[in-house]
Amino acid sequence: MKDLLSKFNECRRIAYLHTDKDGSFAVKREGEKLTLFFEESNGRNDWINNFRFLAVPTKPYKNMTEGVWFCHRGFDKVWKSIEPYIAKIIYETSITKVDIVGYSHGGAIAQLCYEYIKFNRPDIELSGVGFGAPRVLWGFAGKSVKERFKGFKVIRNGNDLVTHLPPVIFGFRHICEVVKVGKSVGLIQDHTPKRYRKALQEEE
């Protein structure tokens, strides 16, 4: 994993666009490469969506023959408000590489974006990382679903509480690889930007 600290810092300072359903995203283009950023919780509505974790079945993509799965309702709602904006960009044939970055709430949305692009633009060189990202999948995933999330990394600092939510007891689990960094100083403190920066600096 390269440049994690710089990705984290840029994710927190970049200017975001906001949809009418409280989705927050930013797009950075450098030639044939796109970097997509997704913002942490930034208001009351984001927190409401965070706690709307009753699972809903995902809507199949066009030409999908298998691979429907159950998703956190709040995150699915936010992603669906962003999806049309992302679709307009990633279907440009000149785009050959996409990097996706999110923190906290934005890390959940980043996972859904990654899965969407993996299915709809399988020709693209794709990478993704979610710092302190919560779980998005409910139940068990089939082989084709797992394949669409393969390659995305959830970065967990210490024992960051948010990366353990929603709880396994409610049927949620991480479908993406979880990469651990840093030492724990407390469930809540481990989620703070300060602790992530410190842990990522130590990784470099």
Question: What residue ranges belong to the model's regions?
Answer:
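Non-catalytic, mobile gating and regulatory segments of ester bond hydrolases
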Residues: 1-101, 105-204
